[in-house]
Curated annotation (Swiss-Prot):
Gene3D superfamilies: ATP synthase, F0 complex, subunit A. Keywords: ATP synthesis, CF(0), Hydrogen ion transport, Ion transport, Membrane, Mitochondrion, Mitochondrion inner membrane, Transmembrane, Transmembrane helix, Transport. The gene is ATP6. InterPro entries: ATP_synth_F0_asu, ATP_synth_F0_asu_AS, ATP_synth_F0_asu_bact/mt, F0_ATP_A_sf. It is found in: Mitochondrion inner membrane. Its main location: mitochondrion. This is ATP synthase subunit a.
Amino acid sequence: MMVSLFSQFDSPWLLNIPLVLLALIMPWKLFVSFGPSWAGTRSSRLVYVTMETLMSQVMQPLNKLGFRWVVLFSSLMLMLMTLNVIGLFPYTFTPTTQLSMNLGLAVPLWFGTVVYGFRNHPVIALAHLCPEGAPNLLVPVLVVVETLSILMRPLALGLRLTANLTAGHLLMHLISSAVLGLMELSVMLSGITLLLLVFLTMLEIAVALIQGYVFAILVTLYLDENL
């Protein structure tokens, strides 16, 4: 039971061939051909307004020096939101439920902010390891605690995204199995459970969008400490 339950998080294979290879050999699908017809559509306007609103909130903590990162953060947030939502469709694979991918995004971004801080403002970066006004006897302990706290940031960033999406997928899988099982016992109970599944799906769509936003804004806050 547990094997079949968690098998939905395995990378899909077809005829003993990993389908991820198919994605890797089709990079041109990632590029969009912008033209006059695309620029004037309502959907493009909706995407533009939505991204403008979200990025204004994400970049709000940063000063002018941080605006050079706006393309990276907007691309990161849009990619995570897209992958999270697409993973809710049937017969799809959600790569953001894999801790390896999330850590692969979190560690380089976090490490880049740390290196940027130590390279441009080494004194300020070191000052973050010891809170202002701390007693002299507690300084060594506080330095160790703050160092561990900073080192745990990418792990917490990746685990947060993985845990939230994995829990939602498992809950949807369990409730959908309950819907099929209750059809033989009571149509009414099955219908009520199906209604619950619909509301849960709507909630998971919101969670998928929010988690992409949270990931991007946390990286922004890490960068703000090192600017």
